[in-house]
Regions:
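FAD cofactor-binding and catalytic pocket of flavoenzymes
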Residues: 118-150, 182-185
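Conserved beta-strand-loop-beta-strand element in the redox core of flavoprotein oxidoreductases
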Residues: 39-58
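Central helical "cap/lid" subdomain
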Residues: 57-122
Length: 245
């Protein structure tokens, strides 16, 4: 990377292919631990002795409500004090030249003014001021570069962030161009072809990276509010159950 003055590297970095890992994890839980998944069944209410769905009542001594992006659903009353909103992101999958190999996930300095662990540091003030001058269009669109290589050789590249109460299902070509520009500025790619584009939505806001609300002794409402769910989900789950006595 021409012009780079420093970098951070983690030897413990691990990643999985979400498209494969999520269904495989569900299959493993069902086969190895007898977990029953009620696919396509909407929960209408949490009751004193369990929960009520569109097909009936399920008895349960404990209930964990993980609403994800459904901020106006069954968890609305519990989440209302935190004034959460949704943010929409854009991402791309690109095919690099044959033989291209990325040895580690790549992120750039824009991430250092977005993620709270870095952005709350006093040093980030000067960095943000410089980025406002050098990459103002990226900051205005909530862009910070993330590049990872999938097992088929393609690169997943992102992402942008636009907050809204009800995000529209439209992606901006201008935003994609800015993301791709940062890709080529950071990674030595002779060329690449865009093979997929998509948008995603997740909740943001609140006082921390995740909310764990305890309405009573038998109910927990858990939602990641920082876009870090894929990285923190297992640790968060362990903390929730470990502290639930």
């Amino acid at each position: 990377m021409d012009g780079a003055v420093g970098a951070m590297h983690s030897p413990h970095e691990l990643r999985v292919e979400s498209r494969q890992a999520v269904p495989r994890l569900a299959s493993w839980l069902a086969e190895a631990h007898g977990v029953t998944f009620r696919w396509g069944e909407t929960v209408l209410d949490v009751t004193p002795d369990g929960l009520r769905t569109v097909t009936g009542v399920i008895k349960a001594s404990r209930v964990v409500v993980c609403p994800g992006t459904m901020l106006t659903g069954v968890a609305r009353t519990w989440l209302a004090p935190f004034d959460l909103r949704l943010t929409q992101l854009q991402m791309l999958r690109v095919r690099p030249p044959v033989g291209f190999h990325l040895t580690a996930p790549v992120m750039g300095d824009l991430s250092l003014v977005r993620y709270r662990g870095y952005a709350d540091l006093p040093e980030s003030v000067a960095l943000r001021a410089r980025l406002e001058t050098e990459a103002g269009d990226a900051l205005a669109n909530g862009i910070h570069l993330i590049v990872v290589q999938s097992s088929d050789g393609t690169l997943v590249v992102g992402d942008s962030h636009h907050d809204a109460v009800s995000p529209l299902p439209f992606a901006s070509e201008d935003v994609d161009r800015i993301i791709l520009r940062h890709l080529h500025e950071t990674v030595d790619l002779a060329s690449c072809d865009v093979v997929e584009r998509w948008t995603g939505v997740y909740p943001v806001g609140g006082p921390s990276d995740a909310l764990v609300v305890a309405p009573d002794d038998r109910v927990r409402v858990v939602v990641v509010t920082s876009g870090t769910g894929a990285s923190t989900a297992f640790g968060l789950a362990e903390d929730v159950f470990g502290g639930w006595r």
